[in-house]
Amino acid sequence: GSSSWRRSFEPPPRVARGSIDWDSLKPALGDAQPFAFSDRSPEALPARRFPHLAQTDCRETATTPEIHALIRDNLGRAPMYSGQIDAECGPRYCPSIEDKIVRFADRDAHHVFLEPESLFTDEIYLNGVSTSLPADVQLPLVRGLRGLEHAVIQKFGYAVEYDMVWPHQIDATAETKRVPRLFLAGQINGTSGYEE
């Protein structure tokens, strides 16, 4: 067997686009020209290799000191802070809003990016507000954001706890070193699944 490590993941709430004052928010534009992942690609290649697609309309807002106070007052109700979830850590680059308020207590605001969940739904992903706080805290948290004063939450944030196999037990092909022909991908590798 492999030794594992407990991790957690807390996706943010999803909000109905029609309930957002979209025009009051700052546009958050993507890159006009896509870039290749490899630094070996000549600059002319990306334009030929990647199709030019219409930009998805995203927006930006920010948390406020009032939202931070609401979160601090309810930290004990968040599973990661109450001890209900005992994962050793959450995602390194996408900390929960609770973690941001605790770790960066000197900041008055944190960016929140409003991103369409897909081209075929009106669900908006609130990137930057990952949380597992109860619904009765999430609603005023979300409605405290500028432009979301009348937001309708379609899916509340929540917490997931899972096992992760230590990276030194997996080789570069994603095959486990202890069990031949067993390949792992996704959260069990401690990633979000981008290696597939």
Predicted segments, located by residue:
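An anion/pyrophosphate-binding glycine-rich loop and adjacent beta-alpha core
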Residues: 1-139
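A conserved FAD-binding loop/helix module that cradles the flavin
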Residues: 189-196
